[in-house]
């Protein structure tokens, strides 16, 4: 299955984007686990992903000097993509938390305080523990999500999504990368 993802970053990071990274086991992973995050278009929402990448950059990366939006073409086997909008996958995820709550919170308590931990969303940690426990071969995780793009707004979190994210774990799926917008 082909995906087109948009990632907002600084131009200095462009060359290293498709290189595998080591993630610290000392910090809480982001909401969809460890990997490279993209916005992807939702059904019938063409252009939303690139706009979300742009808004993400201006809201969350104000110090970047040479802001760019990188477009990447990803080729992923469907059975290696964990779709967390799928009801069955949500049920398995919730059951895993119920059955492993003590282990999850023990691991959480040993992590370093950071912004992700302060936000209180432990989904990424649960996903990492679940993938480890079940030895799941997953190359990407995707989900419709809510991202706060405007810090002047009161709404910080929501269960109603304003976009869709894909967290790429297997970087060999990147078939092409290009700068599609330079914003500095």
Language-model region placement:
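Extended catalytic/binding region for NAD+/ADP-ribose chemistry, centered on the ART fold
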Residues: 25-57
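Active-site and NAD+-binding cores of ADP-ribose-processing enzymes
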Residues: 2, 8, 18-19, 66-184
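Arginine/glycine-rich "motif VI" loop of SF2 helicases in the C-terminal RecA-like domain
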Residues: 60-65
